[in-house]
Amino acid sequence: MKNKLPPFIEIYRALIATPSISATEEALDQSNADLITLLADWFKDLGFNVEVQPVPGTRNKFNMLASTGQGAGGLLLAGHTDTVPFDDGRWTRDPFTLTEHDGKLYGLGTADMKGFFAFILDALRDVDVTKLKKPLYILATADEETSMAGARYFAETTALRPDCAIIGEPTSLQPVRAHKGHISNAIRIQGQSGHSSDPARGVNAIELMHDAIGHILQLRDNLKERYHYEAFTVPYPTLNLGHIHGGDASNRICAWCELHMDIRPLPGMTLNELNGLLNDALAPVSERWPGRLTVDELHPPIPGYECPPNHQLVEVVEKLLGAKTEVVNYCTEAPFIQTLCPTLVLGPGSINQAHQPDEYLETRFIKPTRELITQVIHHFCWH
């Protein structure tokens, strides 16, 4: 029953107080099971049907889908339940205690983005879900901050095809319809060690990597020349050499060298296309030194994303907000949800607060966010 639902600020407080950190390091990684249970119980109290989905390949992580209404289409509101780890020495407040001060709500996940579920639940107090003409879905995912495993698995397995979706990442309530993707690779070269007094008796991995880097930088230039999307601040795919290590002593021929790099592709560029371009760029080195160069993914790749600018979702949201949709450089789960239906990224709080100590959400977002959620539910589920 709706009268069992706690007040907005108490929902927010409970979400922040329930740790759900995602990390690649096992010692820091946490299950989101307790948070999913909280959300599931609240949505059941509102009359939703709730399904909890274990996410394979994770450390006890779950998705939750709450649904109400019948028929095809409808609206999907989505967000992730996890947060990044926190640096205790840089926080001046308890990350797991919601603190209100000077027009701000402080806590880990206030902006990015557990707080979004408090807004949804609060808005639903005034919605008679028994009168919806189209279904309403609420999706809570796992592991967005690391592998995006929750959104990937949900998109791969669901038969759901809503009319549209909104992901409540912190965009300062400015609608986002496109972003770049992210691919990170390790280029590894196996040389042959030996004494530096006789270089010809070994294979210097640093020298081979020097050759490989030349070809990678040529690929960077080619990407800049061939691909353009003028709406982006940086209107071409970027390629960055981020980390390199090789060798262990000045008097030894280097037997191993490793380079970490990333590419941020534009919407419309496929992951297979990018992998092909990278492998083609490195082919001269691989052919000259068979078996010595490998390319491995550091993280699961994220494709670029774009919602059609003429879709009804874009038109409706732009009219409601009085603001045009934007494109951004950071990544979200939108590429995976977009495989199900046209998707926008739109939520309270600033992306500048994401992953920061003393993360906060400004209270000025509370009223307009609640109103926006109510309006989009009315438009897409009642009309």
From Swiss-Prot:
UniProt GO BP: L-arginine biosynthetic process
Primary localization: cytoplasm
Classification via Pfam families: M20_dimer (PF07687), Peptidase_M20 (PF01546)
Binding site for Zn(2+) 2: 112, 145, 355
HAMAP family linked to this entry: ArgE
The protein's assembly and partners: Homodimer.
Sequence similarity: Belongs to the peptidase M20A family. ArgE subfamily.
PANTHER family, per the entry: ACETYLORNITHINE DEACETYLASE
Identification of the protein by name: Acetylornithine deacetylase
Organism from which the protein derives: Escherichia coli O157:H7
